[in-house]
Every structure is written in C-alpha cells, then in structure tokens.
Curated annotation (Swiss-Prot):
Subunit structure and binding partners: Monomer and homodimer. Part of the essential Sec protein translocation apparatus which comprises SecA, SecYEG and auxiliary proteins SecDF. Other proteins may also be involved.
HAMAP family (UniProt xref): SecA
Lineage, highest ranks first: Bacteria, Bacillati, Actinomycetota, Actinomycetes, Mycobacteriales
UniProtKB keywords: ATP-binding, Cell membrane, Cytoplasm, Membrane, Nucleotide-binding, Protein transport, Translocase, Translocation, Transport
Family matches, as InterPro entries: Helicase_ATP-bd, Helicase_C-like, P-loop_NTPase, SecA, SecA_CS, SecA_DEAD, SecA_motor_DEAD, SecA_preprotein_X-link_dom
Pfam families referenced in this protein's UniProt entry, alphabetically: P-loop_SecA, SecA_DEAD, SecA_PP_bind, SecA_SW
Species: Nocardia farcinica (strain IFM 10152)
Annotated protein name in UniProt: Protein translocase subunit SecA
Enzyme Commission identifier(s): 7.4.2.8
Compartments where located: Cell membrane; Cytoplasm
Amino acid sequence: MPALTLTRLLRIGEGRTVKRLAHLADEVLALGSDYEQLTDAELRAKTDEFKQRYADGETLDDLLLEAFAVAREASWRVLNQKHYKVQVMGGAALHLGNIAEMKTGEGKTLTCVLPAYLNALSGDGVHVVTVNDYLAKRDAEWMGRVHRFLGLEVGVILGGMTPPQRRVAYAADITYGTNNEFGFDYLRDNMAHSLDDLVQRGHNFAVVDEVDSILIDEARTPLIISGPADASSKWYAEFARIAPLLKKDVHYEVDIKKRTIGVHEAGVEFVEDQLGIDNLYEAANSPLVSYLNNAIKAKELYQRDKDYIVRDGEVIIVDEFTGRILVGRRYNEGMHQAIEAKEGVEIQPENQTLATITLQNYFRLYDKLSGMTGTAETEAAELHQIYNLGVVPIPTNKPMIRVDQSDLIYKTEEAKFNAVVDDVAERHEKGQPVLIGTTSVERSEYLSKQFTRRGIPHSVLNAKFHEQEAQIIAEAGRPGAVTVATNMAGRGTDIVLGGNPDIIADILLRKQGLDPVETPEEYEAAWLPTLEQVKAQTAADADAVREAGGLYVLGTERHESRRIDNQLRGRSGRQGDPGESRFYLSLGDELMRRFNGAALEAIMTRLNLPDDVPIEAKMVSKAIKSAQTQVEQQNFEIRKNVLKYDEVMNQQRTVIYGERNRILRGEDMEGQVQNMITDVITAYVDGATAEGYVEDWDLEKLWTALKTLYPVSLDYRELTGELDGEPRDLSREELREALLEDAHSAYAKREQEIDGLAGEGSMRNLERQVLLSVLDRKWREHLYEMDYLKEGIGLRAMAQRDPLVEYQREGFDMFTAMLDGLKEESVGFLFNLQVEVQQPQPTGVSVDPGLRSPVGATVPAPAPAAPTPLLAKGITDQAPRGLNYIGPDEGGRASVHSDAEEYGGGTPAAAGTRRERREAARAEGKGKRGPKSRRKH
C-alpha cells in the first residue's frame, strides 16, 4: 500500500505541470506561421544559428520555442505530418526530463523528434532507446528524414554491426538503438585496450520509448558479458570418477526439495584419500570443494532426460515448466561442466562474468533521462524512487470513446476459447476488425488452429519477425481483419482504422527499391504521390470500420501486470475513434490459479453453472485487480532487491571504470605508481613489524619477500648494526623510510633502463600497459568471487543476519583486498618484467597473443621521437574472445547470444587496424546528406 500512497502524492501538482506545458505548446504553435514563410535552405540554416547561439551562452531552454517550431515545420514538409498541440506538450515534458504518458495512437514517435532535435544542438549526442532492432531501424530512417533535412546526422545501432560501424553511429547527433545494444557497448568500452576501440562518446540525454517496458519489465535481468574462465577441466573429470564411489547417507546427504547436498566427514576423508591430499579444506585446496559439490549434485539432483538431454555429444538443458529444450543455455558456476564430465562428453570451458551492469544503473549514467509510454501511471512510484523521473499525463488530442466491457469468466479453458471463437466469428461476419491478445506463443497457435477449423481468415504475430509483423499490424484495422498476437508482438506500429497509410506507403516504396537512407532524393520525390494514393484507398475502409464499431480488442487472459492489459486495450480507440475491449478469463488461467481461483470455482459449482455459461461480476474484477496489484508489488520488490545488490557493485564498478578510463586516455600514471610503491612497501613493513619489539621482527623473512618485489640494495643487518658489531635500536618508522627511499631509487634506475632501451617516455607507456592488464585480470577475478558470495549470501538470514548488510560488508572487504593485490602485482610487474624492443610488424601479421602489443605514441611526451613500442612478457592487450551476452528480451526474460551474433560474424571489439577502421567510418559516413523537401519555393 505505501507505493499507492506515494503514487497519489506524486500526482499532486500534476495540473500545474500540464498547464505549464500547454502554455509552452501554445507559444510554439504561435510561431508556426513565421517558419512557414521560410525556404527549405533558410529553415535548414536555423540549425547552425541555434548551435552558434548555444555556443555563445544561450541554454537549450532558451532555444526551446524556436527549435520546436522549426522541427515541427520540417516534419510537415518531409513527412506531411504536423505536431498537434498535445505532441508539442509531450516533447516539452521529455526535454524537461520527465516521462510523458501518451495514450497509444497519439504519435509518440513523432513527438520524440522535438526534444531529440533540441538536445542534439548541444553537440553532445542524443540516444533514442527502443524495444527492438526493427523499431530502432525504422525510426532512425523515418524520423531521421526530418533530422537529416535539418542538417543533423542520424545513426542507428543494430545487432551484427562491427565496432567501426558502431563508432560512426555514436558520433552522429542522434543515435537510435535498443537498451541491450547501448548497455553492452558501454560494458565493451570498459573492456577495451585502446582509445581506438571505444565506440561510445558519453551519456548526455536519452529518450526511452516504451519506457515502462525497458525500465521496469526488463530491469529484473541484468546485462552480463561472460567468457571462458581459466579453470582446468581436469578436475571435473577427476571428481566425475570419484562421485559414483561415494555412498548416499554414508559419505553425503541430499535434500531433494531444497536441491542441496551436504558432505559428511567420512566423505571428506574418502575424497582426501582418493586425491592423495592431507586437508581438503586448506586454502590451497579450497577450489576443489566446489568441484566435489557439483559432482555430487550432478549425480543426485540432475537426471538425464528429465533435467537435460544428451544430443550429438552435447548436454542440453530441458525447461522444467514447458519441457522445451533450451539450446545455447548452460548452467553456471561449473554445474554444466560437472554434468558433461558425468556423461563423458567433451567438457566445454566454464564461463565467468567479465562485465555486468543492471539496466537501472546503466540509465542512471545519463545526465538527463526521459521516456514515453502509454501506461506509466501504475508504476509512477517506482519510476520516481529508482530513476527520479516524474510521470506527466499528456491529454489525448481527441476525447476517448472506447467502450471497455467487464470481464467474462468461464469454468474451463476449453469453454473460454470456444466462446472467443464464436465472438470473433460474429464480429468478422459484420466487418469489424478484431485484435486478440494472448500471453504465450502456444495460446496463439492453439487459437489459430481453432480459427482455421472455422474457416476464419487471420494473421498470427508472435514477436519473432518484427518487420513482417509491422506490415500485418499496419493492415490489422482493415474491415473484417482478424489478428492474433502475443503481448509483445507488433509494438510501435499503430493500428489505424482502414489501414495505416504511412506504413503501407513505405512498404510499397521499398518494394520499388527506394530507401529513405540509401536513395533519399528518389524516396522523397515518390513519397507524397504514393501516400495520397494509399490514403484514398484506406479512407473508404476506415468509414466502413467505424460503422461496424471500430477495432475490437479481445484479451484471452489477464496479465500479472495491469500495465500490459492497458497496453492491449489501448490499441483500440486511438485519436477519438470508436472501439471496444473485453477480457475472456477461465479458472485455469495463471493469475486465477495463483490468487484464490479455488473459492470462485466453488461458487460456480454451487450455482451449478454449465461450463459454457460465464459469470460477469464486479466482485471478480476487483479481486483480479487486487491480485495484479499484489504481483506488481512483488515484482517491484524483486527489482528493488536486484538494484540494492548491484548498488554495491556499482560503486566498485565506478572506481574501476574511472581508473581504466584515465589509463586509456593516456594520463601520466607516474604519481600513482609512486604511491603504489609507497603503499606496498608500507604494507610489507607493517606486516613484518606487527610485534612491537625489534627482536621479535623476522627481518630475514621480510627481505626475502621484498626481493621478489624489487631489487633491494639495502642489507637489514646494516640497519640493525649487526654488520659493524654495534647493535642499535631500529624503529618501525626508520625501517619504513629506509626501504621507501631504496625502492623509489630502484624505480628511478628501472626508468632509466627502460627509457635507454626504447626512448624517453617508454616507462610511462609500460606503466599504462601493466596497470591496464593487471586491473582487468583482478577485476575479472573479483567479479567471479562476488558471484560466489552473492550465491550463498541468502543463508546468512538463518543466522539472524541481514544478507544485504553482510554482502555490502564482505563485498567492501573483498574490494579493498583486490585493490591491495592490484598494487602489489603492478609494482612487481613493473620492476621484474622482461622487456624487449618490439620489431616493426609487417602489415597483416599479428603479434603473439602471449605478448603485449604496446601503446604507441599516445602520450604527448616532449621527446623528439615517439618511444619505441615494447614487448612485455606476460602482459596482454588482447580483448577476451568467445564471449556470451546475457540480457533481457522484450518479455523481460534472460536471452543469450554469442560474439558471432553480436558482431554478425565480424571480429569483436578491436576489429581491423586503425587505418581500416577509418576507411570503414568514411564509407559508412557517405550518403548522409539530408533529403530534399517536397516544398517548392
């Protein structure tokens, strides 16, 4: 309930905001007549004028009225669409960093043109985020026509694009793409080994389309880049041999319900005998414990042909709920490898997390964030709490006259679907278009078979082929059209009564080989005549559909979120058109089963109602709404929990990525390295002198450790007076100062040696090489350890401890330890690396992966010539290969794809030489001229 109270509080002052936006919109509309008089060239010149005024000190708020008026006039000349007052209000709300709640069909895509144009004038880039690649490409081409006409560059980020193509797209004034693509590019940039490999250029302003879907539905699944771990597969095979020898209830116990195992003392002793070790639990052997646990779990908890199948020498997971095989999915934390070892198939490398971020924390990187949706009101509290975004409801352009009928509840699912088919057949007969919403692909296919059996022509959309689905949705408003769609299918495309003329005209032009990006001039010349021709065809159909009652939306099941139900309903009744909606439910529906469906079934049984007679009661509708509210609250808590845990990682990630950025950008790291030497020597001395008296210090042991770190020139016996036979008291401070002076002196000699070998400035380059390599490896190891910590942290609740507080505390301790290890390893490498001058590489020949192909002349050193590149053995700048990308699909579920899919078979992050990348960028940049307007002057 607190969220509901907060929602009401957040809506206080809404009226004032809407009035302010309406006043701004009136002023923009009043400027319209001034800009109508301008020629195309004069209108385009306004962009440069605005940029100059911004550079001279005017703010974007100062430019808002004029910039909006220019973009509005350009939209009319290019698209034959002029923003309504409510769309201008929506655009202003977006610019001010709010979520504009605009009903379906109110023109959100066109609305976005206004704030995107205004904010692009700053030159810092604008990101427009959509739910799938098709919409990103469509909007970049379609709305990009307006921006290109006004002299701005538009880019689009799609799956399968190479890094040079992505770099060009991000360099554009406005960049379209999906949340996953933007997020993964951010993570990859923070795995890059050279400035040339970076693709993004900052996070200035983002407009998120379908903001509730992206920031809420998909926020439960974090973005993860994983790659092969370094673990050896030898141990999987060894423990697969041992596991069958262990006896249940003698060596270990199993809890089938909780899916856990526990190893007894007898089991530990048996394993120690088998491996020939003294203590399984000593520090050096601790990794073996997880191999043992996984081997026993593979034996007892994972059954072949139930939990997984073996096909073509590969272990494939079976979904426990649907029974479908999940190709490409793998169990994590070594479990999949343990099953592979048990089955005797080839053991694939274990994956580990290399980089991760939640969508919440990614979008909080932006200086300004805004979004559009038709249904944000129910989640206003969450959007405010997590993203600090206000929700502004924008009035509809025309009054809504759709009729929302009350729900019909049937006893069985079969009776419900029979009633659905009867209702659809009747409406199809009278020429009324029908959109049927389902919650799954299986339900869609089942209904499709029923319609085929009854001879009802129909189309099925399953959110798999977005481009074809947009074409079907464009014609879903035709008389008598019947369209079956899952909740996610065909989003972003309006169902216009009689047919969507813009989409249909675009399809016709593309069939003729015309394209708004590739052939802008020919496309623009043919656009208006084709559009007028299509409008003439669809106008008559639209009148017939209005006579039949408009679009009828039929839901076959209530979704657990009211928002999804409202999205489905919102397909009907756009722009003041007539329409109708109704939900058909059954007691077998998921939501009804979860929340007191048994009580309702008892009532229906007592009333002795036949299966095919529905009940229609407000009490039931209220109960369903209450159930949905409970589920929404549960999901909110899950997302909040994900965010709380990621907040720990986020602070650590900010430190590490900030440090990486400094190194990549060529900052002088000498001061930092000197501080590292001081910290490491101090830690060594403090550890060795923890006992208060000199006679208790083991200085020989300290010197042995120091000699592995750097070439020590001091003799401790000299410091204590043993050499000259005059023992003297040595304080901890004196010892520390002497060693620090010696270490810094040794580092100065090392710098002379390196600079003498490869030229002045070479030591600075080596520092950057070493720090970057060690930082990346330590961060990967830290992520691996944090994954393990998070996996078992929930058990702390059994000891009356808050798992989150424990995770924060231990996570901080682990991070501090990781930073200490990073300093120690970096200092050791810098003193002891074997370095040789790199011979020039012939074109096309790659450097051995075990060697560092170093940074060239990235530092503006005052030396007469750039330092010669060095090879440092054991240091690598090669980006990890064979990566997997895990992120939410449109339904919020985790989906996995590989490097090859992400880059379309191209090479990952460091694709091509610098010259090749520049050539690709130039080629990509060609043909970016703005289209000509149809208007003649």
